[in-house]
């Protein structure tokens, strides 16, 4: 499938690329009062199709109330993930609030792709975490 998805007992889906980035994002989220519903590591072989499939799985999890994305483009370009999100929005797969920090390879292009979407882009992961925790605690 090109990704690993682990279910937890919170209400925020965490998406990242690479185990280290995903784990540190989970720690930061927990430290700021958030609870992960699942974490998705899109890995180094992600395609638009595999990320779309993962978003479909996340959208079917009843406890998920928001999505937090922390990507650093390298092997996997951030535009690959942005394309999957745009398709998921078009197909009404993702109707949850999405908060994202995108850096690295093609991140400026992916931010441009997502600027008119429902995704709320942040300049840092700390900002994205604060926004998602505030959304959940409304």
Each model region followed by its residue ranges:
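ATP-dependent carboxylate/acyl-activation modules
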Residues: 1-69, 103-138
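Short basic/hydrophobic patches in alpha-helices and adjacent helix-turn junctions
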Residues: 57-60, 87-91
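Glycine-rich, proline-tolerant flexible connector loops at the mouths of alpha/beta enzymes
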Residues: 71-76
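Short Gly/Thr/Asp-enriched flexible loops that form oxyanion-binding sites at enzyme active sites
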Residues: 77-88
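Short, acidic/small-residue loops that bind anionic groups at enzyme active sites
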Residues: 88-104, 122
């Amino acid at each position: 499938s090109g990704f690993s998805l682990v279910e937890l007992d919170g209400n925020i889906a965490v998406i990242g690329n690479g185990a280290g980035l995903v784990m540190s994002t989970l720690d930061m989220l927990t430290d700021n009062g958030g609870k992960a519903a699942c974490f998705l590591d899109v890995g180094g072989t992600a395609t638009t199709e595999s990320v779309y499939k993962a978003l479909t799985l996340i959208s079917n999890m009843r406890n998920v109330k928001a999505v937090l994305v922390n990507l650093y483009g390298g092997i996997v370009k951030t535009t690959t993930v942005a394309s999957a999100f745009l398709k998921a929005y078009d197909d009404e797969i993702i109707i949850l609030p999405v908060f994202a920090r995108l850096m690295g390879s093609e991140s400026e292009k992916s931010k441009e792709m997502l600027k008119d979407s429902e995704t709320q882009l942040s300049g840092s992961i700390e900002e994205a975490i604060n926004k998602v925790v505030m959304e959940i605690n409304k």
